[in-house]
Structures are given as C-alpha cells and as structure tokens.
C-alpha cells in the first residue's frame, strides 16, 4: 500500500524531500556565527532560501543526480560558513567577494592564528557531515540526456541572475527590509544572512563612475588647485624653495600599533607606550593626534593605499583591497610625486613581497627601491616575525647608503605586531599585563606595543643626531581584532558584538606622530584621517604640495575626517559627527558647497585611480 502511494506521488515526494535540504544548509551555515532564527530578518531568510534552492536545482539539472547536487550545496555551505566564521574571528568583519583576491596573503600569515574550533563550530560541522553522508540515500535521478536538461539548467541560471540583480536593487532592498549599509558589514551579514549579503556585495566588485564624471572635468578641477597649497603661499615662510634643502621623509606604518585606552580606561602593571605618551603631552617639533582608519583588525593594505594615494576607502566597496583589485598600472601617489621633485624612493616590508601584491604595486606607485624579507640582514625575530628593531635598522642602513645630496623618501611597513596573539612562543614573555582583565591575548599585544615604543624612541634618537633635515612619521595601520579588544570594551560597559555608532568609531582610531629634527610647527591632539596624513606631512615639512594634495588640504578644512567608517564635518567651527551617508544630515546654509566638495573628491579620486592619463 505504502509502496503504491509512493509510486503514485513519487515526483512530489522527491521534490519536497529535495527542497528541504537547501533550507537546512542555509540555517546550518548561519549557525556557525549566530542563531539565524533570532537575528536574520524574515524576508531576508526567505531570500536566502530562494538562493539556496535555485543553486541546488541548477546543480541537479547539471549533474542529473540529487545526491551530488545536494552534497555540493552542503559542502560549499559548510566551507563558506567556516571561512566566514574565522574571518569574523580574526578580522571582525565578514567574508566578502573581494576577499577571494586575498587568499595568498591570508595563507601566508595563517600559521600565526589559533584555529581551534569552539564547541558550536564542532557541532554544526558534525551535523553538516552527517547530512552529507545521509544524502547517499537521496539518489533519485533525471533520466533525460544532458541536451534535454540544458533548457531547465539555462532557465535556472537566468532566474538566479535575475534574482541576484533584484537583491542589488535599492528599491527592492527598501521594500523588503533588507539592511543596505555597507559601512557596518558585520551587522549587515547578521540581519540579511551570509548568502544574501554576499549577493548584494557582488554589485560593488566594480566601481561605477561618479555622476557627472568626465576626464576633462576632473583635469580642469585638478588644475584649479594648482598653486593653492599653503606651502606655495607668499605669506607662508615655512616653504622650502631650494630643492637641495628638502628633508628626508621617513614613514613607518607599524603593524597593529594602537593605544587601546581610546576604548576606555584599564590599568596595566607598566606603561605600554611611555615614549609615544610623552610625545603626546607636547614635544618640540612634534605633531601628535589620533588617526582615523577605514579598517580594524586587518586589511593593512587599505591604510597603505589611503596614506600613499590620498584617496579614501569611503568611496570604494567596504572590505575591498585596491592593491589587489584596482591598481594594475601606473597610479599617482606620494612616492611618484616625491620622485618627480628629486627624492630617492624606498619601500620596505620585512615579509613576503607577494603579500597584498606589494612587489607588483609598489613600482606602479613610484617606488624605485624595494626591500622585502629576503633583503633584510641581521634578522631578529619576535615570535614568528622580523622585529621592529630589525625593520628600523633597515631604515637607518638605507639612509646611510642613499645617494649624497639627494633626499630620501623611505616608506617602511612593519610585521612584528601582526596577529594572532593567543599562542605562546619560545623566547617571548609578556612584560605588560592588564589588571583584572584576564586576557592573555591582550597582555601579549600590549607587550609587543611596548617593544615597538622602545624601538621608535631609538629611531628618533638616531635621527636627532644627524645633520640632514629629516622628518619621521609613525602611525599604526589599524587596531587589533576583537580577541584583544573585547575585554577592554567589556570593562567599560561595551559589548564588542553590539557597539553603537559612536562606540564603533573608537575601534578605528590609532595614534600618529610627526617628528622632525628641525623647526616645524608643533601640535598635540590634532585628529585626522589617513587620506589627509601625507598632505599634512608635506605641509609640516615645508615641502610644496601638488594639486591633489592642495585640494585635500582645502577639503580638510570642511571635512577634517573622512573614512569608510565616518565623515566628520566642520560647521561654524564645530564638529558634526555623522556616517558616510552624512550629506542628508548636514543641514547648514553651506550644504550645497560642502556637498560639491565631496563630489569633487569622488571625481578626482576616480580620475586618479581608474582614469589616470598614464594608465
């Protein structure tokens, strides 16, 4: 009887059975990171299921066998869920489409992270594997030849493409309560689900031209800022007119260097950065403040990109890596500009040159002399990475061997403080402990920061005794990941998983120092963002700025901070904080002019990054 009923309704039974598995795959994948029944919005969950169903049925028509189609869906979902979980753990942001370009870099540093699975990860993975094995019994097939299966396959692919296109439509997102804001990617993934968010993000793999853009318009706009920089103003007596008197410019972008006290108070057994703290109190020929970054816990290359080019990640997809996605030919930068006015240009990084494509990108940015791990002599290691002491010795060695009479621009990116911070290492002991926080990762991190602080002091002491004018710039690329910062946040009443917008901004601040061995204007507590820093360095150094840098200095007067996380606007000498959707919140009588400046920035950035004449 049962067999007869099954035979009669076999197709319906198989369709229902087949359709249940993609739903299970979606919810299991989400459980790697959170409880989707509580946090994924209803319509978003429905759309995730549609994506899974479409992919499963396409695979069924391609393979002709249910078990292989379903196994493929489950394996992909399991791998995707695991990747997203560990990316969130180590970087505090979800896996996005352009992370695929970063696989090589991620692999090169993976050994220094703790991949020990939590109980939840183990349970979800076991369920995945059990269901994959159970699919051995779900083995109904399509008996059609492939040429007959081709039509439903093509129709399925077309339906999938149309549906993904709908998910990327702003009106569709609004009508169906999908969260659209890329500048909070973790929350976006949490409430939309991984698959829907990934599909929405695909729209931003390529960067569209800004409204009203033309190369001629951008060139004319850039020309309008020719000769407008402070250092070319007759009233400014700090400008250096003799090129032979240009100072050496040494820039250290230090891996994960930050002062976590910006998140709130916590006590330690000793000061973890006494030298930097002393400079921040006010020091001769020194400028200090906080630098607002676009990244946290990773994606170092984005901070490099913003500093060297003056461009901002605010106008690019969140999580994108310009070094890997956009810089494919000659691109104007601080290095190419300084080279054009007579500087010798050096880029140094004590790790693999292939990381973030640096060995390819640096020459395109104008660096003539490259040094990577194999070029460092007398290597000393801290944990698994070449020490900052070794890295700073390389700077001194480069300075001492540069051509006589030619100023040097040395850009040095360190590795010593790279995460993770949970393993123990022979020969490395924590010298700093945070009282009552019971976080060994935090203790290790602070101990590393103290070592860097000591090495920075030695570097500045060296250049304080050289005859040539030299300016040293030091800043961190980003704060460490949540494993380190969570206990500091918790001690100050904050949950790292549920930070308010104002609290989130604190996670994107690092200290910076501009120091010179000759007279420059001093300042303390001067906050800025990475895109402005190079122009500010040239202004402080007395080196003339080019047209784009002059524009940035002017823009900075109205928008002192622009990053992927925040855009702060000055109105009547006060600072209005807003998100990077801030055009709607300005509300001043100068709104149109201010918006025009931001639009000009978008035009100029697109021109210099994607439409430069030398490309």
Segments predicted by a language model, with ranges:
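Alpha-helix initiation and N-capping motif
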Residues: 100-103, 191-195, 215, 273, ...
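N-terminal post-signal-peptidase region of extra-cytosolic proteins
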Residues: 116-117, 225, 327
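Membrane-interface segments at or immediately adjacent to transmembrane helices
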Residues: 165-251
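Solvent-exposed soluble domains appended to multi-pass membrane proteins
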Residues: 232-240, 253-254, 259-615
């Amino acid at each position: 009887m049962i067999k007869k009923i099954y035979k009669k309704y076999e197709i319906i039974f198989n369709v229902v059975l087949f359709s249940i598995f993609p739903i299970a795959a979606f919810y299991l994948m989400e459980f790697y990171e959170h409880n989707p029944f509580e946090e994924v919005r209803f319509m978003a969950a429905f759309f995730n299921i549609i994506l899974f169903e479409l992919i499963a049925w396409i695979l069924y028509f391609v393979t002709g066998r249910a078990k292989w189609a379903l196994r493929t869906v489950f394996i992909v979902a399991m791998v995707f869920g695991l990747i997203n979980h560990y990316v969130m753990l180590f970087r505090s942001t979800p896996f996005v489409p352009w992370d695929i370009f970063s696989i090589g870099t991620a692999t090169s540093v993976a050994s220094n992270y703790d991949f020990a699975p939590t109980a939840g990860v183990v349970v979800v993975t076991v369920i995945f594997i059990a269901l994959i094995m159970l699919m051995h019994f779900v083995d109904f097939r399509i008996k059609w030849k492939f040429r007959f299966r081709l039509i439903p396959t093509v129709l399925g692919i077309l339906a999938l493409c149309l549906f993904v296109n709908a998910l990327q439509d702003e009106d569709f997102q609004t009508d169906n309560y999908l969260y659209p804001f890329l500048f909070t990617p973790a929350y976006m993934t949490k409430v939309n689900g991984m698959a829907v968010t990934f599909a929405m993000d695909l729209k931003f793999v390529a960067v569209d031209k800004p409204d009203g853009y033309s190369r001629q318009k951008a060139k004319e706009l850039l020309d309008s800022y020719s000769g407008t920089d402070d250092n070319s103003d007759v009233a400014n007596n700090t400008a250096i007119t003799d090129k032979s008197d240009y100072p050496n410019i040494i820039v250290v972008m230090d891996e994960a260097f930050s002062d976590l006290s910006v998140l709130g108070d916590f006590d330690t057994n000793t000061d973890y950065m006494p030298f930097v703290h002393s400079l921040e109190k006010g020091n001769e020929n020194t400028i200090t403040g906080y630098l607002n970054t676009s990244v946290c816990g990773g994606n170092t290359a984005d901070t490099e990109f913003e500093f060297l080019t003056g461009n901002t990640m605010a106008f690019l997809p969140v999580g994108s890596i310009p070094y890997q996605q956009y810089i494919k030919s000659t691109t104007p930068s601080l290095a190419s500009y300084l080279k054009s006015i007579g500087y010798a240009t050096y880029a140094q990084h004590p790790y693999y040159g292939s990381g973030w494509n640096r060995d390819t990108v640096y020459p395109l940015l104008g660096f003539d002399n490259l040094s990577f791990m194999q070029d460092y002599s007398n290597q000393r290691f801290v944990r698994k990475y070449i020490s900052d002491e070794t890295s700073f010795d390389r700077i001194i060695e480069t300075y001492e061997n540069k051509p006589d009479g030619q100023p040097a621009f040395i850009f040095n990116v360190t590795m010593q403080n790279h995460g993770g911070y949970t393993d123990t290492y022979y020969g490395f002991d924590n010298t700093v402990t945070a009282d009552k926080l019971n976080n060994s990762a935090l203790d290790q991190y602070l101990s590393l920061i103290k070592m860097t602080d000591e090495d920075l002091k030695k570097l500045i002491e060296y250049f304080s005794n050289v005859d040539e004018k030299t300016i040293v710039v030091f800043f961190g690329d980003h704060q460490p990941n949540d494993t380190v910062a969570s206990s500091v946040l918790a001690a100050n009443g904050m949950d790292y998983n549920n930070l308010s917008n104002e609290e989130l901004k604190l996670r994107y601040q690092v200290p910076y120092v501009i120091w010179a061995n000759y007279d420059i204007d001093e300042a303390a507590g001067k906050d800025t963002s990475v895109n402005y820093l190079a122009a500010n360095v040239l202004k402080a150094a007395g080196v003339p700025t080019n047209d784009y840098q002059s524009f940035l200095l002017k823009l900075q007067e109205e928008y002192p901070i622009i990053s992927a996380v925040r855009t702060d606007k000055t109105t009547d000498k006060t600072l209005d904080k807003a998100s990077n959707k801030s055009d709607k919140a300005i509300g001043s009588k100068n709104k149109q002019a201010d918006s025009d400046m931001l639009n000009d920035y978008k035009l100029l950035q697109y021109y210099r990054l994607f439409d430069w004449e030398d490309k």
